[in-house]
């Protein structure tokens, strides 16, 4: 028995409505979590962020410190920065880092790695194979 397109579509939506579907991105960066101690700002989940991005803590540390124009150090998975910074300022730096050093410029995939070709640091996408030069920190 032939059914109309509308009937089939309605039936499909009824079946979908029974399922509790939650759409999540495969790549979710943890929001920055800070703590202030006097004139210092501590990024408490620094190690977790670096691990999620699949980048070394040292590389992310150098980018944040240079971008903010401050001094800092890594202490037990936390980033301690000289100066008072807001969560939004630090989140902006992490988002900029992801845009420049993590996401593929061709397919937007986070599955990338650093390689060196003739003394030039390159970002190679493991999904599409594209390679792009990135600026040294």
From Swiss-Prot:
Keyword Protein biosynthesis attached: yes
Domain of life from the UniProt record: Archaea
GO molecular function list: translation initiation factor activity
Pfam families for the chain: eIF-5_eIF-2B
Keywords, comma-separated and alphabetical: Initiation factor, Protein biosynthesis
Matches recorded under InterPro entries: IF2/IF5, TIF2_bsu_arc, Transl_init_fac_IF2/IF5_dom, Transl_init_fac_IF2/IF5_N, Transl_init_fac_IF2/IF5_Zn-bd
Matching SMART domains: eIF2B_5
Subunit structure: Heterotrimer composed of an alpha, a beta and a gamma chain.
Function noted in UniProt: eIF-2 functions in the early steps of protein synthesis by forming a ternary complex with GTP and initiator tRNA.
Family under the similarity heading: Belongs to the eIF-2-beta/eIF-5 family.
The protein, known as: Translation initiation factor 2 subunit beta
Organism (species): Archaeoglobus fulgidus (strain ATCC 49558 / DSM 4304 / JCM 9628 / NBRC 100126 / VC-16)
Organism classification: Archaea, Methanobacteriati, Methanobacteriota, Archaeoglobi, Archaeoglobales
